[in-house]
Amino acid sequence: MSVGGFFSSGFTRQPKGLVGYVLTAYAALFVLWSAYAAVFSRLDALVLVTLFLSFMLVLVFSTIAAVSERPEDDPEGIPVYDWFFVLFSICCGVYFALNADAIATRITLLDPLSVTDITFASLLIILCLEVCRRTVGLLLTGIVICFMVYNLYGHVLPAPFGHGYIGFEHFLDIMIFTTDGLFGTPLRVAATYVLLFVLFGTFLANAGGGEFFNNLAASVAGARVGGPAKIAVVSSGLYGTISGSPTSDVVTTGSITIPMMKKIGYPATVAGAVEVAASTGGSILPPVIGSAAFKIGRAHV
């Protein structure tokens, strides 16, 4: 596998017919519910993030395939194994939402986990790892797995690399049944603040915001030496103020600026690097300032 293969994600499928209509309605209802819940709902925080994660898992398994390239004989629709992933995602969300009070009141590492707790916790971790692989690639997923293995087997390593014994139940207790693991600050921020700003940025971009920023950048830097590269930097910075996402920034502005840079002689790798660097910097500009700022702010409250 090439280096790029470690970063490759699954191809995006677009189911048609009844399944496509159902998924579209599901996604719309999910966005509306999430926006309402983030602002007005008095749901317990654990219930909110549990349902949010479950809904997101269902969307990923429904729309992103397990492989990076679409096979020639690939039928349109969702494979049977992905329907099982969808079912497992729903079951995990329902289980943890129904048991939110028991989870919130239990004493960590003292109250034992039941067999059902261990089963659903293990299943949820597997589902999240698979979603990570499909959306980001093998590299980040491999790093996460390495740290998980280190947690479980680090006690066999010599000093200074080893640590005290951590059993599997202990590991699940911290990762799933406390706010220091999967249901911690990053997911809570994503389910509240980040979702609203990404929703705002999406509406603005589809209303012509991305084209406006590109035109504004072209008027400022288009006539200068290295104009297309400067247009990429300025437009990505401006678009980053409303998206907060380097990925959406690259997709929106890069689809215009990268071909412009290649047309005047920039190597493809340089053109891509300029756009990626500009989009990454643009994602931390106010007012959205990326999700990291919200995570930092919430951690210090």
For the regions a language model picked out, list residue spans one by one.
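Hydrophobic alpha-helical transmembrane segments of multi-pass membrane proteins
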Residues: 119, 187, 200-204, 238-245, ...
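Hydrophobic transmembrane alpha-helices that form the pore/transport pathway of multi-pass ion
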Residues: 214-282, 288, 292
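Conserved small/polar residues in nucleotide/adenosyl-binding loops
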Residues: 299-301
